[in-house]
A protein has these predicted regions:
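Conserved core of the sugar-phosphate nucleotidyltransferase
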Residues: 82, 109-196
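Hydrophobic helical membrane-anchoring modules
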Residues: 199-201, 206-228
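Catalytic metal- and UDP-sugar-binding loop of GT-A-like glycosyltransferases, i.e.
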Residues: 104
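Short phosphate-binding loop-to-helix
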Residues: 53-101, 111-114, 118
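Short, structured coil segments at secondary-structure junctions
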Residues: 41, 61-63, 149
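Short, high-confidence coil segments that cap the C-terminus of an alpha-helix
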Residues: 42, 96-98, 127-128
Length: 228
């Protein structure tokens, strides 16, 4: 049995209630649930939450909420991996040694069923612990700058001041959408950003962090443009 687990706590600060806030016609979490259900590569979609309203919305969209996440895993400091580990442990009776787990973020309206299928296929064929979505940086990270305490500019890597962009290695970052992993990898809390993982590459125009009101507005505009 393959399971998609969507972590969705109720205490978001910068965008209050963002997991159930309406995004282009439906609660944000609804987009992730629907993509997982339509993918035909998971047998169930489980939402891990501490919040009754999120649980109610999740059930409405066809997900299961078989447990309430404990408060110790719902604060501002707990990472995703222990949350997924807890969910896997709670679902032990439904899983077997071949079960594969997809951590799917609640704030991933750009994720598609095809993306999830690609991730599962790569996990099965690559022998990796994890497979997750990535995209490329729009600008060479080797030419990044910082603003110091005196409001002056410094290069992070000054040795690349005169290096042409096309001569710099392309860099990638986590797309923040989904993370397929083996049951053992999640239970063992293995390192996701390491040599045990493989990527599913997404185009930059389908990747958007949604952490601030400005992010939210940009995501809505982009989403509507892609739907038109």
């Amino acid at each position: 049995m393959n399971v998609a687990i969507i972590p969705a706590r109720g205490g978001s600060k910068r965008i209050p209630r963002k997991n159930v806030k309406e995004f282009c016609g439906k609660p944000m979490i609804g987009w992730s649930i629907e993509a997982a259900l339509k993918s035909d590569c998971v047998d169930k979609v489980v939402v891990s939450t501490d919040d009754p309203e999120i649980a109610e919305v999740a059930l409405k969209f066809g997900a299961e909420v078989p447990f309430i996440r404990p408060g110790s895993l719902s604060d501002d400091f707990t990472g995703t991996t222990p949350v997924i580990k807890h969910a896997v442990e709670a679902l032990t009776a439904d899983l077997n040694e071949t079960s594969l787990i997809c951590c799917l973020y609640a704030t991933a309206p750009f994720v598609t069923s095809e993306d999830l299928k690609r991730g599962l296929e790569k996990l099965v064929t690559s022998g990796s612990d994890f497979v997750f979505s990535v995209t490329s940086y729009a600008f060479p990270i080797q030419r990044a700058i910082r603003i110091n305490s005196e409001d002056r500019i410094e290069m992070v890597n000054r040795e690349h001041f005169n290096t042409r962009s096309q001569d710099l290695a392309e860099a990638w970052h986590d797309a923040g959408q989904f993370y397929w992993g083996t049951t053992d990898a999640w239970l063992g809390e293995r390192v996701i950003f390491g040599l045990g993982s493989s990527p599913v590459i997404l185009p930059r125009h389908r990747v958007q962090d949604i952490d601030t009101p400005e992010d939210w507005l940009r995501a809505e505009l982009l989403f509507k443009a892609l739907q038109s």
